[in-house]
Amino acid sequence: MILTNHSLIGVALTHKSIQYSIIFLIALGSHYLFDMIPHWHYRTPSIKEAVNAPFGKRTLRVSSAPYDEIMRIILDLTVGLGLSLYFFSASPMVIVVGVAGAVLPDLLVGFGRFYPIRVLVLHDRFHKWIHARHMLDDWPLIGITSQIIIAAILVFLLR
């Protein structure tokens, strides 16, 4: 699922709460729950591997400049935050905490590409394990439409 959808779903489920820890944990859990549903992703293929370098630094091998992918992720995150602020009347802090919890798992996967430390590798394995086995990446019309429908239903029902 794209970050916009995870943001909207996480905030839809938590915007009426005032306990930041509860908001964060429910939004975090929603990420894993909704990743079980077949969905579409945009690709981020340019980062191939991280290798050890002198003095413990990581050196990335990339197939192309990853700036387009990074900008796509930033735009996706910004749209999700903006739509969450638009649709829900909760305090901005509640919305930011909900968005943060909802998108953290995908951001951890991304950080794991840069810094493949044990905790991030274990998280990546768990994230892949819990993920839907059937992906809609090759059917963007179906995948994107299904994500819009899921987010719209939750926004409408929980607003």
Predicted regions and their residues:
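N-terminal membrane-targeting hydrophobic helices
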Residues: 1-159
